[in-house]
Each structure stands twice: as structure tokens, then as C-alpha cells.
């Protein structure tokens, strides 16, 4: 690894940073979103993180909620050094119970009544530093609870700062140390003044300066990229036409000019006319070095007979890197004896924070990982371990989707690219359940084209964050032209989301949904039935595989 990497300061070296330790909650990421909306930089790591390996000191720590019981044998915990850092600690839900349980294992037990949803919470003013968490927020709040276990006995050294009907210790604070616990979820939007509570903790108790803003990101990241890459090395990067890779490519162009080479790989899994449209759009709006590589035969050949989703992602990720390493050698050779001469050392990806979080296991075990993301866990081991010919460069990995869109606008990227629906690197390969074959790719490609076209025609494309058609591995009986058919089931999915960490199904009008279904069944040979996926994220993910 280049020495420049050591001198390029990461954000936590520049900004006061609140560390969020994830205990497994489905809403842990919302804590980060609330902090960043306040201008406080934050990072989330699994609760298994060892403090001695952290390499930096946060100004405060938040322990998230989680689905476990603190008294269970396999309950997740945190490094005891968290409480020896000398910084404020806030426990949320499970994190609150963990703080109490560490002080007294008898203090946490199952409650008599489960407490889910909104409830009224009374704030207790006790005349000590414990009042600072709810300072300026009145005498009561409507808060969101989601728990069965609770603190049933106040641990020694703690005081009660809030109660509800079913939780006598809905808020606790240590008498002398800046350690707080709350049983409710301030990160959920339905909690009254939840963001204010997080602000009190981060800015008043931790003393974090609210100076994280996207305006600073471009200059800082360009400086970091230049230090990291140096004066001679060249960078190649995958582009798909999606907002993530487009913004990353534009940033690299700004940082190192013509030493950045964008590569659009046609892996045989693109949408209808995707390659031509993406090339035309990127050429028109970005002015970058762009090469189109046809890898369709290679990808489809390697995927033949493979049905397991993780295996497909790994194959696709590995094949991408194989092709990029070949392209790197070609670029180096063409640049010989020119002012662009230099080794291709870096591979650019538009990885976002959501990609990293989705690939994380909060317990540190592979079994807890949601799935390998194509921009994270889908890369071959040699790439992740730095053993490949190319080293990984991910300048957007600290940002959420909405932050990337805002950053793209700051860079002057055309709205046509900023507002484009996401399309995954593995393409239609993860929208075909089971084996990927040329026949099945063509079927889902046609269905997807009809779906997206009708969304555009209805004038709702910009209301939908992401939409696509997928193909199930099972088949269903149908009747077409008085004849029995036995065809595939097409799954339609459309969601709305701010940051891609959570999502809700889009509510189509019934007439439009029926019209879409009718066209797909009538116009796409091989499809006998159409269904609409109404699963939220969580518990589902946006992509099916």
C-alpha cells in the first residue's frame, strides 16, 4: 500500500465523530442519519469492534438497539474499554439494558407487558448532569418503544430520568459519569423530538462540533485522492450509468484528470439498450475516458448451472475484476511514451455506506450478514485483502444515497443522471432467481422494459426510488388463446427510499398495476403470471438476491 494512504486523513481525523456500535437493530443506521442531519459526523461499526484496534478516539459512543436479550448466553456485548475511553455513552433500547446489566445482572428481566409502538413518557428533572439529555424538551414526550425485556431494578450509581406506564426506568443516567440509557428509539421519526434528544447528547454532552457538511466533502476528498494516487498512477473504474458510479467517476475526473479511465462492462445482464444509452449519456455529460467492454460470453459462461445467490454474486464480482485487470494492462501499454504513462494501480468503485452496512455482520459472523453486496462483499478475497493487481478506491463509502445525490449536484452533474434509478453491478443476474441463462435474461429484460416504460408514461418515475422486474425460478399455469401455458412468474418491485437503508413499496393505482401486468403477460413470451412484491426494507432487501 502506498505511503500516501497513511497521510490521507479519514473523516474521523478531521471531524468530531460519534461512534455508533451496532447491536443488531433494524434502525441502527437511522441514528447515523439523525447525527449527520445535525452536522455531526458519525460512523457505525459492529458491536464486536475492539477499541484497541480502532486507531482513533470518538467524542462519544452510542450503543444501538438489538433483538437479543442481554442475559442470553449468546447475547452481543461491547468491548469493556468503551466505558474507559472517558467519553459519554448513550445506550438505546438494548444498549440501555446492556448498560444496566453490566452494572447489575439482576437489573434486566422480561417485562410483564410488551411495549411496542408509541407511548407517553414522563421526564424527571433530578437537578444533576442527567438532566442534560432532555434539556429544553418539556415534561413529557410521545416516544416509540419496541421491547419486551426492560430494566426492572435501578443499578447502583444510576438515577431515573424518565418513566412510562410499563417502563419504570425508561431513561437512566449515571450519577457521576456521562453514561445514559433510554429504552425508547429517538432515531425513529415518530418519536417526538427524537432528533433533539440525539442533538443534546452529541453536541451538548459530547461537545461535538456540528461542522460536517457536504460543501467540504469535495475539496477534502479530491485532496485525499491526489495524496493516495500520487502524480503518476492511473485509475480505472466501473461505471454503469447509475448515480453512485457516475458521481465517483466525476470526482475522479476532477481529482486526476485523464489518468482516470472509466470502463462500462456489458456483462450480458444489462437492461434493454442499456449499454448504448449509458455510453451516450456519459459521453454527453461527463467527458471522461470511457471504454465499453463486451464480457457477455464470459459472464454467462461462468454463471451457467449456478443457482445459489451468494455464489452468483461472487462469480460476477470476480469476473469483473478479471476483466478490469486485463483492461489495466491494455491502458498501461497504450499510455507508454506519453505524458499519461504510469502504472494502473487503483480500481474505483461507487460503494456507499449502505452497501457496507448491508454487508456487515453485527455479531462478526458470516451467518449474520444480510448478503454480500456487489460493491463490498461481492469482491474476490484477493481484492479485499489487497493482494490483487489493483487496489480498491472507494471515495463515497462514507455517504448515504441522498448525500451522494446532493454531492452530485454540487459537482454539476446533470439531473438526468442524478435522478436515474439505481441498477446493480451484477445487473439482471441478481434479478433472476435460480440459474441465469440467455433465455431467462431475455425474458426479464423485456418485462423490465415494459414496467419502467409504463412508470415513465404514467409520470411517476421520479416518485419511485427504484423499480424493476425479476423472474422467479418457479412456473405457473395460465391460459393464452384458449390454450394452456406453463410459464414463469414475473415479480415486480418498486420502492421509495431516502437513503436505501430502509424502503417502502410504492403504492400504484390498481388500474395502472393491472395494465402493467396485462402488457407483460401479453407481450413477453414465457411469462404466465405477474405478482407485485409489497415487502418493506426491513425485513426484506430491495433486490431479491
Swiss-Prot record:
It is found in: Cytoplasm, Cytosol. Its EC number is 6.3.5.2. GO terms for cellular component: cytosol. Keywords: ATP-binding, Cytoplasm, Glutamine amidotransferase, GMP biosynthesis, Ligase, Magnesium, Nucleotide-binding, Purine biosynthesis. Residues 212-420 form the GMPS ATP-PPase domain. CDD domains: GATase1_GMP_Synthase, GMP_synthase_C. It comes from the Eukaryota. GO terms for biological process: GMP biosynthetic process. Its main location: cytoplasm. ATP binds at residues 240-246. InterPro entries: Class_I_gatase-like (IPR029062), GATASE (IPR017926), GMP_synth_C (IPR001674), GMP_synth_GATase (IPR004739), GMP_synthase (IPR022955), GMPS_ATP_PPase_dom (IPR025777), NAD/GMP_synthase (IPR022310), Rossmann-like_a/b/a_fold (IPR014729). It catalyses: XMP + L-glutamine + ATP + H2O = GMP + L-glutamate + AMP + diphosphate + 2 H(+). XMP binds at residues 313, 482, 537, 543. The active site is at residues 93, 185, 187. Residues 17-211 form the Glutamine amidotransferase type-1 domain. One of its GO terms (molecular function) is GMP synthase (glutamine-hydrolyzing) activity. Pathway: Purine metabolism; GMP biosynthesis; GMP from XMP (L-Gln route): step 1/1. Catalyzes the conversion of xanthine monophosphate (XMP) to GMP in the presence of glutamine and ATP through an adenyl-XMP intermediate. NCBIfam families: guaA_Cterm (TIGR00884), guaA_Nterm (TIGR00888), PRK00074.1 (NF000848). PANTHER family: GMP SYNTHASE [GLUTAMINE-HYDROLYZING] (PTHR11922:SF2), GMP SYNTHASE-RELATED (PTHR11922). This is GMP synthase [glutamine-hydrolyzing].
